[in-house]
């Protein structure tokens, strides 16, 4: 649906008096005409004063015809995704990681027992970085699809320390 007025009318009809949030559509960078986003895991060890670290990341490529990556066709390492999309290099990943760490730090100040957040990060066609959402219990299964198991081992280690 492209008509914003019709979308709002439909939401009002379906939700009646309940509130709702409409998320802005991002023109995500693409690989082979399929949008992708990045999952970045930020964790810290036990103890409120522990520093946040990025312990893993991967890219989720949407299935053909989908605008969102919830239905991913494949999971690949982020450097490979950036290369295939021809939008940047490791410095773009470093920027996304810094943003995820800043967000995790702020969330940790508000929720002192929080030790893990999985951020879905979008990169648009102009290399702007967007936090799509953060998950306190991110799905770690996609890390098993990567050839290198070191990130998953690191994530699991942080969960137990």
Enumerate the language-model features and the residues they cover.
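Phosphate-binding site of ATP-dependent enzymes
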Residues: 1-75
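Hydrophobic residue at the +6 position relative to the catalytic HRD Asp in the kinase catalytic loop
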Residues: 119-121
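Glycine-rich loops and low-complexity Gly/Arg-rich segments
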Residues: 45-51, 65-70, 78-85, 143-148, ...
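Short solvent-exposed loop/turn micro-motifs enriched in small/polar/acidic residues
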Residues: 33-35, 113-116
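Short histidine-centered catalytic/ligand-binding loop motif
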Residues: 1, 73-94
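N-terminal start-of-chain detector that recognizes signal peptides
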Residues: 9-15, 90-95, 103
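C-terminal active-site "lid" helix and adjoining low-complexity regulatory extension at the edge
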Residues: 91-94, 98, 105, 110-114, ...
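Internal, well-ordered alpha-helical scaffold/interface segments
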Residues: 38, 55, 94, 98-101
């Amino acid at each position: 649906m492209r008509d914003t007025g019709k979308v709002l009318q439909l939401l009002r009809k379906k939700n009646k008096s309940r509130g709702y949030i409409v998320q802005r559509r991002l023109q995500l960078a693409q690989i082979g005409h399929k949008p992708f986003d990045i999952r970045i895991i930020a964790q810290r060890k036990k103890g409120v004063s522990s520093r946040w670290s990025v312990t893993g990341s991967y890219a989720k490529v949407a299935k053909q015809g989908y605008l969102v990556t919830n239905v991913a066709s494949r999971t690949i390492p982020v450097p490979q995704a950036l290369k295939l999309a021809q939008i940047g290099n490791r410095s773009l990943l470093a920027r996304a990681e810094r943003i995820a760490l800043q967000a995790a730090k702020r969330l940790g100040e508000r929720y002192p027992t929080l030790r893990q957040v999985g951020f879905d990060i979008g990169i648009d066609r102009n290399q702007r970085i967007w936090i799509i959402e953060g998950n306190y219990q991110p799905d770690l299964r996609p890390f098993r699809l990567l050839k290198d198991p070191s990130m998953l081992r690191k994530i699991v280690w942080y969960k137990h320390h």
